[in-house]
């Protein structure tokens, strides 16, 4: 006889960026503002943003997990990425000028300034813990998320029990091993079928979590075109964490 999923869950894991928090504006905006702040002409926002996407992709391929396996310091990884972002956008600065720009960018993204917390994030995490569930975060993010950024945003250990961050662990989504590591961190011999993972990517969240036996569902906060494909592929897709809580409490999800 089928029973409600909530009654069987012992742990919920949650993606961070796009699920609990979001960037304010485009990343390229902050790069341009940093250049402008030291008296330089404002670079073209769109070009810099596109340059960043290319540079970030290159760095993630050459030095995954923010340089973890190459033992590259986090600040060096980001300095290379930021420099390449500007170069790919057609902007090259001398070393002294670039250092001033970079210091501003690195400091900004190590603070709460460029991020916002979705209104339903804290209430959902608190609700989950009130149900006796262990709450974990699983994110392709560097160490500053855990140590600085999330606490500065008010998402501290009062809201979650453990975190698995790619820049600290050396494993990143969509590698299923990051979800196996989350199971280990949850402790208490929790089995995959006792865990629900919530994220915003079919490839990085839903697929690998399901592949190791976890339950999973996806959020479509920004009404993406891909959401229709997710639904057609069999995923449960919801607009926000309020809807997730309502669905779990309704006992409509069975296992």
Residue ranges and their predicted role:
Residues 1-12, 43, 92-93, 122, ...:
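Asp-based, Mg2+/Mn2+-dependent phosphohydrolase catalytic module
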